[in-house]
Regions:
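Helical element adjacent to the flavin cofactor pocket in flavoenzyme catalytic cores
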Residues: 77, 109-161, 166
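Glycine- and acidic
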Residues: 58, 91-92, 113-121, 210
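General beta-strand structural signal in soluble alpha/beta enzymes
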Residues: 87-89, 146, 177
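Conserved active-site and cofactor/substrate-binding residues in soluble primary-metabolism enzymes
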Residues: 67, 71, 101, 124, ...
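Rossmann-like flavin
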Residues: 3-102
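FAD-binding beta-loop-beta segment adjacent to the flavin cofactor pocket
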Residues: 98-106, 263-271
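Alpha-helical scaffold segments in soluble metabolic enzymes
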Residues: 74-78, 132-135, 187, 214
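Mid-domain catalytic core of redox enzymes
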Residues: 151-269
Length: 272
């Protein structure tokens, strides 16, 4: 299945797999767009410091539209019957640390963002975005310390006063921790300053890691697109193996990225 960039072509694709597929897709995406807008307006910009943030008037008024009590799989199957279309819409949820059966219908907002709004590729790769941000920061006086592993966040009187690294201790006015929450709490803070104990983190379902292969091919691969998802095995079984039985999948699904399809100079001539 080739997923085009054009929305009209995507609608034609859904029509080719299922009767009235385009109409069903538009209804599905209209609903997903509402979830996306609600999430962006009322949840995304909240600091996440207290559960009371969820009790705002606008959030409560729109709560039923988020479908938090309906599974994402059930929501998809209300719209579509074709197994390939179902797999296409279910796949992104695997990266959130859950399955379509367990995750709420709210997660349809991911399909809205990826399929309806579109997926974009910065020329030079995503590292170029980081490089550009770093350049802007440097022009504004920011100093970067690279290869500087943080080993501890030091707290005095309930206030962070410094950060220890393997090389030095740095006094701080404030700290922004962009690492994994569980890592910061359990590895960098003293126990008395942690919000959650080890038992809590052990009971959580984390988003999965990935096994990555970087492969160079000495010829052009005509049947690959920039992004290719292989749905030739049972996705429901895959989800059960990852999240329920917690074993290495017997027949894993996989994703292939071939960026030279969009930017030819990433590979030598005639190669991928």
């Amino acid at each position: 299945m080739t997923l085009p960039a054009s929305w009209n072509e995507i609608c034609d694709l859904f029509d080719s797999y299922e009767e009235n597929g385009a109409n069903k897709l538009n209804k599905f995406m209209d609903d997903a767009e509402k979830k996306y807008s609600i999430g962006l307006r009322f949840l995304y910009n909240s600091p996440g410091l207290s559960i009371t943030e969820l009790f705002k008037k606008d959030v409560l008024f729109n709560a039923n539209k988020l479908q938090l009590l309906t599974s994402y799989r059930k929501h998809i199957k209300r719209h579509f019957k074709n197994p390939r279309l179902i797999s296409l819409l279910e796949f992104p949820v695997l990266f959130l640390g859950t399955s379509a059966e367990s995750g709420p219908a709210l997660y349809s907002l991911m399909s809205y963002s990826g399929i309806k709004q579109g997926t974009f590729y910065p020329m030079g790769g995503f590292a170029k975005v980081i490089d550009s941000m770093a350049e802007i920061c440097k022009k504004n006086g920011v100093k970067f310390l690279l290869d500087e592993q943080v080993t501890k966040i030091n707290v005095l009187n309930k206030k962070v006063e410094s950060v220890s690294t393997k090389n030095q201790e740095l006094a701080t006015n404030f700290v922004v921790g962009a690492a994994d929450y569980a890592h910061i709490e359990s590895k960098l803070l003293d126990i008395k300053y942690q919000n959650y104990d080890s038992a809590y983190w052990e009971s959580r379902e984390f988003s999965p890691s990935a096994l990555l292969f970087y492969i160079g091919v000495n010829k052009k691969l005509k049947n690959l697109e920039h992004h290719t998802l292989f749905f030739d095995e049972d996705m429901e079984k895959l989800s059960q193996e990852i999240y329920d039985t917690k074993v290495w999948p017997e027949k894993p699904l996989f994703y292939t990225c071939c960026p030279a399809k969009s930017q030819e100079d990433l590979a030598p001539d005639g190669k991928e």
